[in-house]
């Protein structure tokens, strides 16, 4: 599936010429794609020598449209089936509640899944499944709510349902909603899109803690150190934000990708790529990541050691699976494709669509094959789109309702045994923490924390301190943390261990003790700022920054420590990544904004970092991509954008109805997806955020503003272009020499603020005082919708808090609006345009040390 964003959620294609000649689309009808049996499909798949795929399940076993897969402690498989996903080219009836989570069991424990039940049916596109003990967490589409289900009579069908986390509705396209729900080493549960993590809290509702957004879309994975790996489709990066655990920030560094990493090498040439010609080679193969998803870090013990620790990521549009070889040098993680102009797995079957991968209890890797013709959601296959023409050209929309699960095995290994961990004692589970298969270690830790049995604390402490297996020690440490039984002496033992990875875990796990009040550990943490290992130094900087953050405030002088550690290090990696960690800022809003405005801005930042960043970048400069010219981005920059900075209605209209065509003189080949399905508050939040970020300063937009504009554009079909949007917005009327201008201070120069001369200005010469005013008399009474004051030549002299009044005779005044200035360009929009002959701006509050100035004054919607 395609997942991307374009202010806030879209996929853009950018011209990319990898060859001298450019592919020119040809939509001549072709023979419709064939539906192959699993046995026939297998013959189309290329794998490296020694590897093979085994069929585990298919539509013969009743599965349809599988999208996610996971295992419980007894090795039973749960599959989320999106049975209404794109059943025709328009995605008709997609939100009918007929999706299921199916359960599959190997009754003979031989890896042959021969018992099949519908664990839960009548669901709305179930997207996340997390087995606990005999309970299972499930989340459906269009909601953030997560319910806990239980099969109480052993028939394989859930018969109880209780709310676990109530998050409320989730609006937007189904491809731009959360996925993942993985229980990670730090005992927190993570998802994509949502800038928070959850923690099991017994029978109570979960703990919830805000975190940076990882920028993931479909799929989540963790490695042996508990670091989450995120995939990115809309930004066409493949994998990203893998430098640090996401708790500390979503960081990327130059050179983390091998030079050609983002180029892909399919076996099949069908140009059903959202990027169109710009993403297509002359042989019609995809030339670049465009739908990356379903990643997994190989952690099983029944696959070659050379593969373990590498990340596999699917590219379903390219019908391939990329292997990312992972190396760490000087604290910086690097990834590369080990196959020259080829891939780990690829197929010539057009319907080969791997959308997820997971490590299995048997030490092998499981691949979820949606097996379908059309993979993009209907929003990107609308009438007139490039993609629709290709879909119809090959009849891709006619292949649906299938699904396969494959097991990746190697000739040198036999799959391992099936587990019965749900029936094991806590003591037996402690022993499983030493298992060579990461799935067993993860599951044992999760079950121990769920049981909450502290009788095993001595055994866990012994394992953590004295095992010869570093991975066992790591899991024991975090299990103690999850049970609330971690002691400072255990943390200190890790902080001084010879293994640098264990020192890092000592820092990370020790944070929970500092947050609980044991600040004595900070002195121990500080010693690692001079550690000989770059990764340990970086972790000490991240730990210091986290503990000193405004939300925690447990490390008062953290800035001094971080600066010292960064300056003292001779490591290039510490210098590069450490500087990024140190300077990253999450601040939004502030004291210049009212409480309700700050609330909108914070919500807008959350939305932006969940959705919009994938195309516009975290810094609002546009997501950089490869192309024939340097500096190409997948979407236009938002800083200094006329649409964003201009009349407030512009960005709202763009969000509601989308945009297409050239933007700022540059052509981006796909249109912006309309976001009208989201609430007025949602639109207001993200619009206000982009208008007050990336160097922009503009009036905050309210939900009432959005409701008004939504009513105005009701019935509009199609999207805006730059030209049509500009024509639809109220005009700015420049000042005229016919205006009579006066002021409470320096009235003799008041006309300078309305002379349309950028070289002159009116200025009070004294500090702003309550009651100061500036007045304009128009030649005739006119309908005015707002005012705009520009003081670029004196940027700090803007009015901090002011009101605007109107009058027909200069004696009786009526209120037009009251607002506060934010920058050198101040805007005041009236709740409704009113007829007035006089306008008076009056300061509501004094401002010490700053005069009031106006360089250019304009009226909005002068008629």
Q: Which role does the model predict for each range below?
A:
Residues 748-863:
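Aromatic, loop-rich ligand-recognition surfaces of beta-strand-rich domains
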Residues 416-419, 441-452, 471-485, 490-496, ...:
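Structural detector for internal amphipathic alpha-helices that build alpha-solenoid repeat scaffolds
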Residues 368, 405, 604-619, 672, ...:
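The canonical Cys-X-X-Cys-His
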Residues 585-609, 614, 619-626:
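Electrostatic cytochrome c docking/interface patches
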Residues 19, 337, 409-420, 482, ...:
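Post-cleavage N-terminal segment of exported redox proteins
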Residues 628, 632-639, 658-716:
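Axial heme c-ligation environment in periplasmic c-type cytochrome domains
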């Amino acid at each position: 599936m395609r997942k991307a964003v374009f202010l806030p959620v879209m996929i853009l294609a950018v011209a990319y010429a990898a060859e001298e000649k450019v592919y020119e689309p040809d939509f001549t009808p072709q023979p419709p794609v064939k539906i192959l049996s699993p046995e026939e499909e297998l013959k189309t798949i290329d794998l490296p020598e020694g590897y093979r795929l085994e069929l585990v399940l298919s539509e013969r076993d009743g599965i349809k449209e599988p999208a996610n897969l996971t295992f419980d402690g007894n090795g039973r498989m749960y599959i989320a089936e999106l049975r209404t996903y794109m059943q025709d080219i328009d995605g008709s009836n997609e939100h009918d509640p007929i999706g299921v989570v199916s359960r599959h069991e190997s009754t003979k424990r031989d890896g042959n899944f021969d018992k099949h039940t519908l664990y839960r049916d009548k669901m709305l596109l179930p997207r996340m499944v997390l087995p606990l003990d005999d309970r299972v967490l499930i989340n459906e589409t269009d909601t953030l709510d997560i319910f806990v289900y239980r099969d109480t009579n052993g028939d394989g069908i859930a018969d109880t349902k209780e709310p676990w986390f109530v998050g409320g509705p989730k609006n937007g396209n189904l491809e731009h909603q959360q996925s993942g729900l993985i229980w990670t080493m730090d005992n927190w549960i993570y998802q994509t899109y949502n800038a928070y993590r959850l923690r099991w809290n017994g029978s109570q509702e979960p703990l919830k803690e805000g975190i940076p957004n990882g920028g993931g879309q479909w799929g989540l994975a963790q490695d042996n150190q508990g670091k989450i790996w995120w995939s990115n489709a809309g930004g066409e990066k493949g994998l990203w934000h893998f430098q640090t655990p996401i708790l500390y920030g979503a960081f990327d560094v130059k050179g983390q990708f091998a030079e050609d990493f983002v180029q892909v090498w399919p076996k099949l040439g069908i140009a059903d790529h959202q990027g169109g010609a710009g993403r297509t080679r002359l042989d019609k193969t995809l030339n670049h990541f465009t739908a990356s998803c379903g990643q997994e870090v190989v952690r099983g013990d029944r696959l070659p050691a050379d593969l373990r620790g590498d990340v596999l990521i699917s590219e379903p549009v390219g019908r391939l699976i990329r292997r990312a070889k992972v190396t760490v040098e000087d604290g910086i993680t690097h990834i590369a494709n080990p196959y020259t102009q080829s891939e780990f797995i690829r197929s010539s079957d057009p319907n080969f669509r791997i959308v997820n991968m997971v490590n299995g209890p048997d030490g092998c890797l499981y691949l979820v094959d949606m097996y379908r013709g059309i993979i993009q959601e209907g929003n990107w296959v609308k009438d007139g789109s490039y993609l629709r023409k290709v879909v119809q050209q090959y009849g891709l929309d006619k292949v649906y309702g299938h699904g396969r699960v494959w097991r990746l095995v190697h000739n040198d290994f036999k799959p391992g045994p099936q587990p019965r961990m749900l029936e094991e004692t806590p003591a037996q589970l402690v022993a499983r923490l030493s298992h060579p298969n990461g799935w067993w270690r993860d599951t044992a830790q999760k079950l121990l924390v769920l049981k909450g049995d502290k009788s095993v604390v001595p055994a866990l402490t012994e394992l953590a301190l004295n095992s010869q297996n570093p991975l066992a020690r790591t899991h024991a440490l975090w299990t103690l943390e999850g049970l609330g039984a971690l002691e400072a002496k255990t943390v200190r033992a890790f902080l001084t261990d010879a293994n640098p990875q264990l020192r890092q875990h000592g820092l990370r796990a020790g944070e929970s003790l500092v947050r609980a009040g044991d600040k004595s550990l900070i002195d121990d943490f500080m010693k690692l700022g001079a550690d000989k290992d770059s990764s340990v130094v970086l972790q000490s900087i991240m730990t210091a920054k986290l503990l000193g953050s405004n939300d925690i405030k447990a490390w008062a002088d953290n800035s001094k420590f971080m600066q010292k550690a960064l300056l003292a290090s001779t490591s290039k990696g510490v210098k590069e990544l450490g500087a990024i960690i140190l300077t990253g800022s999450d601040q939004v809003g502030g004291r210049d904004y009212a409480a309700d405005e700050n609330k909108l801005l914070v919500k807008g930042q959350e939305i932006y970092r969940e959705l919009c960043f994938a195309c516009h970048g975290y810094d609002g400069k546009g997501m950089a991509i490869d192309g024939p010219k340097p500096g190409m981005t997948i979407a236009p920059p938002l800083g200094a954008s006329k649409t964003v900075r201009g009349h407030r209605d512009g960005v709202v209209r763009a969000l509601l109805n989308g945009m297409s065509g050239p933007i700022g003189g540059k052509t981006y080949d796909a249109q912006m997806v309309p976001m009208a399905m989201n609430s007025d508050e949602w639109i207001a939040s993200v619009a206000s955020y982009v208008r007050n970020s990336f160097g922009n300063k503009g009036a905050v937009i309210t939900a009432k503003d959005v409701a008004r504009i939504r009513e105005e554009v009701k019935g509009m079909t199609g999207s805006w272009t730059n030209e049509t949007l500009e024509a639809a917005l109220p005009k700015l009327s420049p000042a005229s020499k016919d205006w009579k201008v006066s002021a409470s201070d320096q009235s003799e120069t008041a006309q300078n603020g309305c002379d349309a001369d950028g070289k002159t200005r009116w200025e009070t010469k004294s500090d702003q005082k309550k009651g100061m005013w500036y007045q304009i008399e128009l030649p005739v009474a006119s309908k005015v919708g707002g005012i705009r004051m520009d003081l670029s030549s004196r940027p700090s002299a803007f009015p901090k808090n002011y009101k605007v009044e109107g009058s027909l005779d200069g004696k009786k005044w009526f209120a037009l609006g009251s607002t506060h200035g934010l920058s050198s360009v101040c805007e005041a929009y009236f709740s409704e345009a009113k007829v007035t002959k006089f306008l008076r701006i009056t300061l509501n509050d004094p401002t010490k040390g700053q005069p009031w100035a106006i360089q250019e004054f304009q009226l909005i919607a002068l008629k």
